[in-house]
């Protein structure tokens, strides 16, 4: 995750802003600079290589002291920054909006995946600039539309029906901020369209998850799609979701947290996110993740008959 201010800076032209991507040498210069505390939140002028991000975001970049940040010296950083600018420059951002826009925290890996989709000549985003820009504006939180299958970050499709598409995420192969844990495995489920879904299509998805992904929890980050993650990683997801939720509220980015369909979401996660939305502390919310929940009556009678026992998955074992 990183703020948009880690990728680009605003340049005032008439009554709105044009966004310009940072170059790696300007960032490198900022990372070595000594800057007064009062100037930590201001864009840094490297003198030689142009404007650089505010020094307060130093930890967002990979250095010899911090291996958890972005690999900003890669060509992928340039592609992601350019794509963000392309999307922001397609809309009008005024002086009253610019601080809010740049403070938004975005998924670096999501944006890299959109670059990969753009470069794939078989993908619809390769052929439609309008859909590409729409996908980016959704990814950076500027659009109120949810991420549907057409505008999704992408990956490898492992399941699809008339209402849902399930993707295996490919973060292990990334350049900008790769997942280093070789045991990482995670999925995302997007809606094919943002409209009411029939019970039969929900039932098909739940049957698939129950039989093929029984070692995983279905959660949501509140953005209109589902994530299918290992139970061992749920606490980590909870920390990130809570931090992003609080940060957005603090910066005035009052984004509605979408709890999604309670029949699909893991019970404990639904309790966690509901508690978070009520304003409870992280400690109180996280207790709900490890609490034994009363099993609700199965909304879909006879669901287990939809699959034969030899189809039960070994994924995640």
Swiss-Prot record:
Disulfide bond annotation, renumbered to this chain: none
GO cellular component: host cell cytoplasm
DNA damage among keywords: no
GO biological process, one term: viral genome replication
Subunit structure, as described in the record: Homooctamer. Interacts with VP1; this interaction is weak. Interacts with NSP5; this interaction leads to up-regulation of NSP5 phosphorylation and formation of viral factories. Interacts with host DCP1A, DCP1B, DDX6, EDC4 and EIF2S1/eIF2-alpha; these interactions are probably part of the sequestration of some host SGs and PBs proteins in viral factories.
Binding positions (ATP): 107-109, 188, 221-223, 227
Keywords, comma-separated and alphabetical: ATP-binding, Host cytoplasm, Hydrolase, Magnesium, Metal-binding, Nucleotide-binding, RNA-binding
Protein name: Non-structural protein 2
Compartment(s) of residence: Host cytoplasm
Family, per entry: Belongs to the rotavirus NSP2 family.
Active site: residue positions: 225
Main localisation: host cell
Region described as RNA-binding: 205-241
SUPFAM superfamilies according to UniProt: Rotavirus NSP2 fragment, C-terminal domain (SSF75347), Rotavirus NSP2 fragment, N-terminal domain (SSF75574)
Single GO term (MF): ATP binding
Any one Pfam family match given in the protein's UniProt record, by short name: Rota_NS35_C
Enzyme Commission number(s) from the entry: 3.6.4.-
Gene3D superfamilies: Rotavirus NSP2 fragment, C-terminal domain, Rotavirus NSP2 fragment, N-terminal domain
Top enzyme class: hydrolase
Function as written in the Swiss-Prot or TrEMBL entry: Participates in replication and packaging of the viral genome. Plays a crucial role, together with NSP5, in the formation of virus factories (viroplasms) which are large inclusions in the host cytoplasm where replication intermediates are assembled and viral RNA replication takes place. Displays ssRNA binding, NTPase, RNA triphosphatase (RTPase) and ATP-independent helix-unwinding activities. The unwinding activity may prepare and organize plus-strand RNAs for packaging and replication by removing interfering secondary structures.
Source organism of this protein record: Rotavirus A (strain RVA/SA11-Both/G3P5B[2])
Cofactor requirements of the protein: Mg(2+)
């Amino acid at each position: 995750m990183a703020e948009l201010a880690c990728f680009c800076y605003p340049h005032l032209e008439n009554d709105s802003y044009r966004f310009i991507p940072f170059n790696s040498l300007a960032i490198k210069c900022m990372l070595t600079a000594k800057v007064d505390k009062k100037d930590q939140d201001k864009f840094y002028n490297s003198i030689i290589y142009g404007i650089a991000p505010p020094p307060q975001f130093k930890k967002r970049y990979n250095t010899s002291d911090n291996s958890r940040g972005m690999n900003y010296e890669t060509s992928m950083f340039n592609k992601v920054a350019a794509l963000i600018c392309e999307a922001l420059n397609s809309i009008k951002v005024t002086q009253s909006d610019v601080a809010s826009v740049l403070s938004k925290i975005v998924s670096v890996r999501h944006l890299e995946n959109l670059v990969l989709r753009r470069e794939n000549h078989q993908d619809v985003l390769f052929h439609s600039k309008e859909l590409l820009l729409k996908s980016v504006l959704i990814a950076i939180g500027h659009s109120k539309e949810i991420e549907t299958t057409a505008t999704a970050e992408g990956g490898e499709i492992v399941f699809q029906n008339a209402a849902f598409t399930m993707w295996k995420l490919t973060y292990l192969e990334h350049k900008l901020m790769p997942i280093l844990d070789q045991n990482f495995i995670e999925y995302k489920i997007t809606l094919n369209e943002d409209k009411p879904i029939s019970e039969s299509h929900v039932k098909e998805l739940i049957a698939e998850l129950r039989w093929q992904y029984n070692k995983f929890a279905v959660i949501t980050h509140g953005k209109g799609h589902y994530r299918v993650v290992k139970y061992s990683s749920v606490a980590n997801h909870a920390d990130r979701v809570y931090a992003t939720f609080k940060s957005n509220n603090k910066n005035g980015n009052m984004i509605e947290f979408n709890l999604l369909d309670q029949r699909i979401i893991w019970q404990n996660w639904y309790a966690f996110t509901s508690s978070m939305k009520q304003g409870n502390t992280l400690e109180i919310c996280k207790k709900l993740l490890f609490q034994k929940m009363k099993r609700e009556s199965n909304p879909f009678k006879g669901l287990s008959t939809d699959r034969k026992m030899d189809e039960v998955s070994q994924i995640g074992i």
